[in-house]
């Protein structure tokens, strides 16, 4: 439940306003939904951040990465990255080849709103999210005239970040152009605990050993992103929109800590050119709304590996996706009923080659969903959703979701929520057709999920606001797809696992005015997520039964705190991931377990207001305590490093 809003925000003006009571009704579209919202203030902290960085410090979900500009994946509630659906302005951007999304390729400055849909709540947005879904969108900032925002960032390891936004609004038109450019040698130093150097005496006897200090080799990157938005609002209130996003990326793949060769002997890099475009139309009236969207995705991926000028891998992939959707909703206000529906089509065309092998495949993916939400009284709501999907020529079983919520006490705004759902995920095109190893006989992964939660929100208007929530969840997933070695010398996917994931997620936020010009905001989240293989052994030597899944921490947590005084702002960010096993048997011999780690970042910003422009100066320290850690086996992470950002927003209308 939310507080009755008054137009002035105490976090900005610090004015004394009398207390108010909480009486507003929860939006009907949110009935039974377990979600985490990340606002633009967090998304636009600094231009060097990707969505992987944002999610690490602002949620309890697991972000797996091996440093900046490297593959970064996200997983909910003990599931895998392919069980997370990602939607950008209505367009699903999961790779049809791999089934997952690289969040390091999504600059946070290109996103205005991000919502995490946990568990069953993802079904309303997309099928296949056995763990959850991430919903990303851009929003118009309607202002007449020209606008400009430029930020220059300089950081350690020869890192340079640039952001430029040009806006123009006149009448019913609004245009926005954003450009993000990042480049770095990324050659930080680290202590290599996977190697030992001997110490010799004068007689060449070994008298000791030490772990050498090395540089991150072959790790440079250069990324360019251009996002164009165009909006038009008709006299009747309808809206037309265009969103076009182009990416050009060159990334070297760093050498592992176990590589003994010199960097000039290797060429190991990947290139990506991609375009994502969506056009939309929204017809909005008092009680009903209808919308239509069409989109297109083109992606060209290139991966090259050579050693001593001998090319051993030259992989090329082209992906074309055509997208269309129609949606609508109707509200019976007097009866407290909201009906909605959506039909979406994705047609994927993939051509992948590596020398003389590869595959050429296409698949249509049709999805339809209907939902009904009923709120007969202010303190109670019920929702039911049914989704049906077609993958190629195969229909899935119906995907139902039932959710209920109710306010059990207005004192403290205590609300209980529960839901149950069935879900599934179809094999990716690589699972089916990759050569060598693809398995066209794979079955879809299916599962049942249950969760229940409690939340409370209290506060004193213009003094403080506190919100806490906790959720319990449980999922059973069958026919989990796993790539296994074969006697033919390559890996092939099989439906082998039955996985039981369960646990608790908790969140808390506090906003408080300490004094007239002092403000404090705290946000925290934590998750305990055992995810265990409970299937039958696939061989006599299978020791994975009853063990935690690899690269799934049982515990994770994050905290952000912002202290503001007039034009000064201090931001502290902390995140923690528990130990992760690298083997399905949880064997800790050699490097079978990655130790837990704690990450601490801090930022200090000062804003300046002149008649002709607003300026900002920000300094950031990452890995404040210079912790030595790894997130992925044999991939070193950077120690303490520094960044400086300078931003400017000219005031065209006020300039004389």
What are these regions (language model features)?
Residues 338-340, 344-346, 350-475, 560-562:
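Structural signature of Gram-negative outer-membrane beta-barrels, strongest in the C-terminal barrel
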Residues 184, 188, 217-225, 231-290, ...:
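Flexible loop and strand-edge segments within Gram-negative outer membrane beta-barrel domains
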Residues 91-119, 436:
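Short acidic/polar hinge/loop motifs at secondary-structure boundaries
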Residues 375-379, 471-476, 495-582, 614, ...:
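Gram-negative outer-membrane beta-barrel transporters
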Residues 287-303, 409, 417, 444-502, ...:
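Membrane-embedded beta-barrel scaffold of Gram-negative outer-membrane proteins
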Residues 19, 51-54, 72-75, 101-107, ...:
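N-terminal periplasmic accessory domains that precede
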